[in-house]
Amino acid sequence: GASRSEIVANWQPENPEFWEKFGKKIAKQNLVISTIALTLSFCVWYLWATIAAQLNSAGFNFTTDQLFTLAALPGLVGATLRFVYTYMPALLGGKNWTFISTIILLVPVVWLGFAVQDTTTSYATFMILTALIGLAGANFSSSMAYIGNFFPKSEKGTALGINGGVGNLGISVIYFLAPFAMGSAALGSVFGVTPTIIKGNAVYLANAAFMWVVPLVVILALMTRFMDNLPLEKPNPKNLVQIFGNKHTWALTLLYTCSFGAFSGYAAALGLLVGKEFPEIPFASIAFVGPLVAGALRPVGGWLADKINSGTKVTFISLIGLCASTALIAVGVDMHNFPFFFAMSVLTFVCCGFATGATFRMIPHVFGNPLLSSLITGFVAAVAAYGAFITPKIFGFVYSMFGNIHPAFAVLLAFNIVTVAVCYWFYVRKGRSEERRV
C-alpha cells in the first residue's frame, strides 16, 4: 500500500473513495493532536490572568493600571503575531510549525514559575514575560488556517468548530485547575516551590505555571508521530490585496471582533473586575464558568448555522443578545448584586459562543475560493484577538480616569450596536444573504 507520506503528498479530501480509505483516519489524527496543542496554547495564553489577581497579595506592589496592562499584553502580542502565524504552515509546513510554535511556550512557562517566587522581579521583567505568554495566543491563527485543509468542505465547519471550540476551552481549563494547583502542597514539593501566605493560606503561585511543562512535552512527542505536513499553495501578495480590497473582509472582521473580542476580553478582565467591584466574592473558584460556556457553545453555533443553512441568522440574534447582556452587566455593578452581575456575564459568554461559531461558518460561504477563505479566517481571527488586549485596557483606563466602570460599558455597548447595524445591512436585510457574495 501507499506510505503515509505518499498519501499526504497527494491529498484529495473531496474524493470520497480517497477520503474513506486513507483520508479520514489521517485527518482525524491531525485534528486530535492539533486540538490538544491548541487547548494547551490557550491554557498558557490565559496563565497570566489566573495569577494577576493574586500578585499583590503575594508581596508584589503593582498599581491597578499596571495590573490591567500586564493582563492586556498577552492579548496584544497574541493578536499582532496572528497575522504572521497565519502564513507559517504554508511556508514551513503545518506539522513543523505546530511543533516550533508549541516548544517556544516552554520558555515563558518555566521563567514565569521562577519570576513569581521572587518578589524583587520588576514590572519590566513581567512585561517581557507576559509578552512571551502572548505567543501562545497567536497559535490559534496558524492552527485554524491549517487544520481545515485536511477535510472536505462538507466537514470543514465541524472540524474548525472542534479545533477552535475545544481549543478555546483551554481558558476554562486553566481557570478551573489553577486554584487547585496553587493550593496544592504536593505539587509545590514536586516543583520545589516556596509558598506565600495569602489570607492565612499557603499559596504556591508558581505551580500554575510549572504544571504545563509535562503536558507540553507529551504533546510535542505525539506531534512527531501523528501530525503531517500537507503540501499547501504558497500565499502570494496578490491574494492579500484581494482580501483587503474587499468590503466583506471588513464586515466579517467586525462581526467576529465583536463576538470573540467580547469573549476573550471579558475572560481576561473579569477576575480583576470582580476583585475591584465585588471584593467580598471568592471569584477564583467560579472564574472558569463563563469561558467554559462560550467555548462549549462555539461548535454548537457552527452546527446550528449548518443546520438552518444560515450563519447570518445565528450571528445576528446572538449579537442582539450581546447588546442586552452588556447593558445589564453594568446594571448589576450598579445594584452591587453579584448573582445578577454574574448571570449577565454568563449570558454574554453564551451569546459570544454562538456568534463565534456562526461567524466562522459564514466565511467559506461568503468567499468561494478556499485559499482566500483560509487567509481571511486567519486575518479575521487576528484582528478579533485585539479584544483580549483592548477590553482589559479600557477597564484599567476608565478606572484610573473616572474611578468607576460605567464609561467602559457605554463604549462596549456602542460598539456592539454598530456591529448589529453592519450585520443587518450586509447580510440580513431583504435580498441579502451570505451565499457566494465574492
Protein language model annotation of sequence segments:
Residues 81-94, 298-310:
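Helix-to-loop junctions at the C-terminal end of transmembrane segments
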Residues 122-138, 339-354:
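Hydrophobic core of transmembrane alpha-helices in multi-pass small-molecule transporters
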